[in-house]
Swiss-Prot record:
<feature type="transmembrane region" description="Helical">
    <location>
        <begin position="33"/>
        <end position="53"/>
    </location>
</feature>
<keyword id="KW-0472">Membrane</keyword>
<dbReference type="InterPro" id="IPR006369">
    <property type="entry name" value="Protohaem_IX_farnesylTrfase"/>
</dbReference>
<dbReference type="InterPro" id="IPR030470">
    <property type="entry name" value="UbiA_prenylTrfase_CS"/>
</dbReference>
<feature type="transmembrane region" description="Helical">
    <location>
        <begin position="156"/>
        <end position="176"/>
    </location>
</feature>
<keyword id="KW-1133">Transmembrane helix</keyword>
<dbReference type="InterPro" id="IPR000537">
    <property type="entry name" value="UbiA_prenyltransferase"/>
</dbReference>
<keyword id="KW-0808">Transferase</keyword>
<feature type="transmembrane region" description="Helical">
    <location>
        <begin position="207"/>
        <end position="227"/>
    </location>
</feature>
<feature type="transmembrane region" description="Helical">
    <location>
        <begin position="95"/>
        <end position="115"/>
    </location>
</feature>
<keyword id="KW-0997">Cell inner membrane</keyword>
<feature type="transmembrane region" description="Helical">
    <location>
        <begin position="249"/>
        <end position="269"/>
    </location>
</feature>
<dbReference type="InterPro" id="IPR044878">
    <property type="entry name" value="UbiA_sf"/>
</dbReference>
<dbReference type="GO" id="GO:0006783">
    <property type="term" value="P:heme biosynthetic process"/>
</dbReference>
<keyword id="KW-0350">Heme biosynthesis</keyword>
<dbReference type="GO" id="GO:0005886">
    <property type="term" value="C:plasma membrane"/>
</dbReference>
<comment type="function">
    <text>Converts heme B (protoheme IX) to heme O by substitution of the vinyl group on carbon 2 of heme B porphyrin ring with a hydroxyethyl farnesyl side group.</text>
</comment>
Amino acid sequence: MTRQDLVLFRPRLALLNGIAAVAGHALVPDAAHATLWVALAGVAILAAGGSALNQVLERDLDRLMERTRQRPLPRGDLSPAMATALGCACIGTGLLVLAAGGPVPPLLGAVALAWYLAVYTPLKRRTSLALAIGAVSGALPPVIGWTLAGGAPGDYRIILLAGIFFLWQVPHFWLFQRRHADDYRRAGIPLFTPGAGRLGPSFHVRLWLGALAASVLLLPAFGLMAPRMAPWIAAVPLLLLPVCRPRSEATLFSCLNAFPPLMALALLLR
């Protein structure tokens, strides 16, 4: 496998998922540092395997899109069987790593993976709401990190953090979809257009970003983030509000990529 073939695993997206797990782990007081690395590695490897299987399932769509036609499967550099084997190997490894924290973390990992592959992936072809539905699986990595550190999965604190990551994903991936709208139309994938009407897309991006900032500002009230840190993290989406214009969407997307690492850092320093 060449360096170019690593796109099968989408390493940057896998790392973002691992960082989200670190954010959840950081919420647990006095959690062991060793399990933090388990959360990062286990979730990232699991996400890499999920990306590989997703590309096997969507290889027909990838051939139609300019952005994805140079991936290993559309190019013919890897067979679907080989890509499936590599994906399953990553998934098995990721689940084994997560099992170091007991049965709950790998169970949650399996649920997130099943939601991504069995719910989001087929719905992506059928409905524009798939983007919001798929965000559920992306909200689970913080919960996995939390349970690895010994937290209960139903605790209100981790539910709040998972909700914040859900709010982050929708504008983040919506902007990504809008940047590649022509590709999506070429492949026949319905575009997510929340509240389409006279208000226009900029209004709805601002609405999601405002909700994200407000949720972050709630964290100190529950003792989940140092009061001095919350305004700085909330500033990431708030500072983007004035530039919510079509020509600024690439900048918005890139800036929103910084949100999970900043959240994880703020929670680690609380």
